[in-house]
Every structure is written in structure tokens, then in C-alpha cells.
Amino acid sequence: MHYVSVEGLGKSYGVKPLFEDITFHIEEGDKIALVARNGSGKSTLLKILAGKETAESGTVWIHKDVTVALFEQEPVFAEGKSVLDNIFYHNHPVINAIREYERAEDEGDADRMTDAIVKMDELGAWDFDTKVKQILGKLNIHHLQQTAGSLSGGQRKRVALAKTLIDIGFEHKHVLLIMDEPTNHLDVEMVEWLEHYLNQEKVTLLLVTHDRYFLDAVCEEIWELDG
């Protein structure tokens, strides 16, 4: 399946061009690393693909059935809400059930836990909850009632990574996962787990990273952005 076509893309800040006349195509199952010197516009290009910035020239076509999931270097949260509510923000019966189950478990509320278990059974939500617990555990995310605004920089990155992985695992069959420096603030064990997870999940991936070992382990193509 053809996911993305980019033709003649250009972007500048002031009089200085970040990049010009970029053309590429992404197919389902591609795992691509984007490399360039600092300041060449890698992060900007990723944001354009995700619809968070606009190009000054060229076109971006994304298949109507493809959802773009962007993991950014500076994640944005609802600062006053809990980690739990930031991760499980979808209004969907399965997500609502898992959110209620995780909240009851985190707070040790036996009555709410019983009700939540019944709802999880009704919706067949246990398989996805198992995946959620694996992601949270591997990324060392345990205090789900903590507010997002109280998280350290490293915690914010790990919560954002968990949120991204849970999103792509839950809702969409056809996802282009765009990741901007995902291994920053991860220890060696977490990086190895993320490498295994991305390979196991067979995602379509566009990656920016300075971690050459991670890049070689996960990606099958390397594109160089001139600038």
C-alpha cells in the first residue's frame, strides 16, 4: 500500500532555506532513517508530514486510510491532568474501560476494581490491556495519578513515548509512525526493548535519531537531508 508521496517540498525561516525541492515516497512496511546535520530541518520536515507545520512549496499526499502518529522531542500534555488521562485520552469504550481499570488498580479501590473487571470482560479488553501494561512497565511508568505538569524532562519523554505506542496499537491499522529522537532519556534496557518492539510490530516508520546502533537495528533505509 502506498502511504505517502512528497513532491518538491521546500521550507525556509526568514531568508535562509531549511530545505528545497525534496521528493520522496513511503510504502507500507518501510522503515526509514532521516539523517542530516543539526539545523537542516529534520524536525520541521517531520512536523510538516504530521500536519503541524506547513511547507512553503511542494505537495504532501497521504493516503486517506493512513493515520500519522508523531513522537516529538518536546511533547505537549494537558499539564493539569494525570498521566493516566493524558495517555488514555480517547473517548472509546475499550479505552474508557482500561482507564477506569488502571485508575482503580492504581488507587487500590476494590469496589471500583470489581466493576472495572466486569466491564473489561464485557468488552474483551484484556489483550490490549496486557500490551498497555507491557509498554508502561518497560518504560518505568508507574505513578499514573501524577499530574503531567509535575513530570521531569525524562519522565515526559517516556510518557509521551508510551502514549504514542499505545495510540498506534489501539486504533489504526495503517499508521505512519514518525519518531524524532525517541531514545533520548531512555536507559540501555529501554532502548533495547523499543528496538525489539518496533521490529515485532512491523510498523511503517520514519525515524530521526543520533543513536546509530538503534538506527541500524530498526531501519532498512537511510535518507540524507541536504542542507
Residue ranges and their predicted role:
Residues 1-227:
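ABC ATP-binding cassette signature C-motif
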